[in-house]
C-alpha cells in the first residue's frame, strides 16, 4: 500500500475512533485546527506524563514551571521574534497557492533521497541476503548521481538560508524545476518574508491598549523566570527548568494533519550550564533524548539525527531527532545549544541583571543553555503512525489494531461481560470498581464478543477481560492480549498484579535508568 494511502487511513482512523476531530466541524471547520477527542486526550496526557516524569521525577536538578501565554511584548523584541521570526513564502500565479520556499526545496532534497532508496530497495530484492548496501551506495552510478545532486542542492540551500538570500531561494526553485503541487506549473512570484506571530490588543479601550502576542514558543517564559526559580529553589548550576504548554504560529502552509498546526503544544526543557561546558552537555542530552524515544520500542531504524548546518541566530550547535513518518523522516524533537543569547538579550532589554552567582568559583556569569524541545502533536502523530497496523487473519478478515505502547494506551483494560444478563454485567462492574484506581478501565456490553475485541484493538487497549458464567463459579476470567490475540484463564485477584506493572509509566521510565 502506498504510504500516502496509509497516512489517509491513519487520519480517518483518528476521527472514527475518537482520537482527533476537525475543530468547529459543524461550522465546516477551521483550517489546520484540530480538537483532541476522548481517546486522543488520554493518549496525549500519557505522552506528557512520560516526558514530565522523565525530566522532573528522574532528575533532582530539573524542576517545572507553567508560565503565562501572554507576556510583556518587549520579551519578543529581545528574543528576536519581532524582527527575525519569519518564513520565506512564494506564490504560484496560476493556482494562487502560497508555499514556503524552504519546504519546497526540502521536499526536492527528499525526492533525491527517495530515488536513492528505491535503487537500494530494488537491489536488495534482487540480491537477497548477499546484498551489501554500503558497497552498493558507493558504486552504483544512479545512486551516486542522485547523491551528488542532493549534496549540491543541500549545500546551496543551506547557504541561501544562512544568508537569508531570498533571490537565491527563488533561483534554486527555478533551477530545480520545482512545480506547484496544485497547478503543476513553474509560474512563481518572488520570495518574501512573513512574520509568524499572532498579535492582539490588551486593554479596556483602543486608546490605551497594548499590543501583545500569543507566544510562538514556551522557552522565553522559562528564561525570564530562571533566576526566580534558581533563588527560590536554591538551585545550583547545572540545573534545568521544564515546561509543557501551548504555542501559536501563524503558519501560512499548515499541512499533514496535526504535524504542522497554528496552535500546538510543546514540551521544553532549558538546562542552564556554566559557560564553556555547553558543548560537553550537548551530546549528553542528545543521546539521552534519543534513548527516551527508543524506549517506546519502535525500532532504532525509525529514528535518526539530523545535525544542522544552518544554525539559528541563538545557537552554536543544533540537531533534530527525526522519525520515519509515512511522508518521510520528519523532526519530532530539537536539541539546541542556545549559548547565552536569550539571557543576555533579556538583561539588555530589561536593564536588570539576571546573572548567576556561582558559590564554588565566587563569580557571577550569564549561564549557557541546552534546550530540548518536543512538539506534543508531532509526537502523538509519530506514535499513531507506528502503531496503526492492518493484519490479515487466518479466516481472511482484516484486523485493524493500534499497537500502542501499553503505558501510553488511552484505556489499559476493557472488561466485557459475555452477555447482558444473569449477573455478568454486575460482576464486570465489580471488577472495574476494584481496578479503576490503578489504571484506566472501560466497560462494553454491546455486540458479540468478537466485535468488542475488534473495537478495543482499534483504540489500542492492550488487555481485555471477558466475564462469563464460569466467573461466577470460580472467580476466573479470560484475559486477552491485544498484540498476539492469545488468551489465558486467570483469577480476578491476579489481574492487578499481571497488568499494573506493564501499563504504568514507570515501566517506560525504568528503561531510562
What are the roles of these predicted feature ranges?
Residues 1-513:
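NTP/phosphate- and nucleic-acid-binding module
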